[in-house]
Amino acid sequence: MNITKSYVVIFFLVMLTNSLSNSDILVSSVIETSKYDVCFIPCTRRYEDRECNDDCLAKDFNDGGCVDGRCCCKY
């Protein structure tokens, strides 16, 4: 019984540690895209910064570019 209890405690400690260690990665993308107003279409090799910027300007935004794999526009 005590061995099972120990395994359960260790399992939960590993899960807690893993969830806390991944939080820094998620926060960095939120901070980077917070400078932009709208993010949409995914950026690819054929749809890069220039195409993204052109689309943003066509939609009456002041600027645009690829951020974290998405086309983001700002006023």
From Swiss-Prot:
Localization in the cell: Secreted
Cysteines paired by S-S bonds: 39-73, 43-66, 52-71, 56-72
Gene Ontology cellular-component terms listed: extracellular region; plasmodesma
Listed InterPro entries: Defensin-like_dom
UniProt keyword annotation of Chloroplast present: no
Protein name as catalogued: Defensin-like protein 59
KW Zinc (keyword) present: no
UniProt keyword list: Antimicrobial, Disulfide bond, Fungicide, Plant defense, Secreted, Signal
Family: Belongs to the DEFL family.
GO aspect biological process, one term: defense response to fungus
Range of residues in the leader sequence: 1-19
